[in-house]
Amino acid sequence: NKIYAPLKDKWLVVKPEEEVRQRYICRLVDSYGYDINQMDQELKVTNSHRGQGSARADIVIWKSAQEKKYNKSAFIIVECKAESVTIRKEDYYQGYNYAAWAGADFFVTTNLKETRIFKVVKGELPKKLEEIVDIPTADMANNEKKVKELLNQTKAFTRDEFSRLLYKCHNIIRNN
C-alpha cells in the first residue's frame, strides 16, 4: 500500500496521517491554485527537539517558488492529523508554534473531517487562537490588501457552536 507524495517526488507507505497530508496537498493545488514548487512537507521548523525528534511542519507553503528557494518566511503552515484522530486544543497550539517559528501568517489544522484555519497573532503573549474563514488562494498570496482583508475576516459562530457555548455559560452561572 503506497501513496504518491508529489512534494517528495516519491511513493510512501500509506499511513493514516500521510493519506490526509497528500489529500490536503491535492486540495491546495486543485482548490487554492498553489504550485507544488512553492510547497514542502515535513520541513524542520526549529532546532529544538520535541521528545525524540525535531519539530517538523506537515505542509509548508510560501508565497512563491522563489521565496521557497531563497528560504524566506513561510506563508501558511498546515498541521495534519489522521482522519480517525480528534483534533485537540494542544494540536492547534502545536500548529500555532510551528507557524510562528516559520514566520507564517496562517496555519491550518486538518484531519479532513474537520479543518480549522487560524491567523498567527504576532507580537502578543499569551498566544491567542483567532480562527478565520479561509486561507488565501495562490492568486491572492502576493496581494497584501487581500491578505489583510482575509486576516480580518474572523469566523462566525455556527448555531451549534453558539448553543454549546451558551449551555456551558448557563451551567457555570447556575452552579455558582
Pin down the residues of each PLM region.
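Non-catalytic, mostly N-terminal accessory regions of nucleic-acid modification and defense proteins
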Residues: 1-176
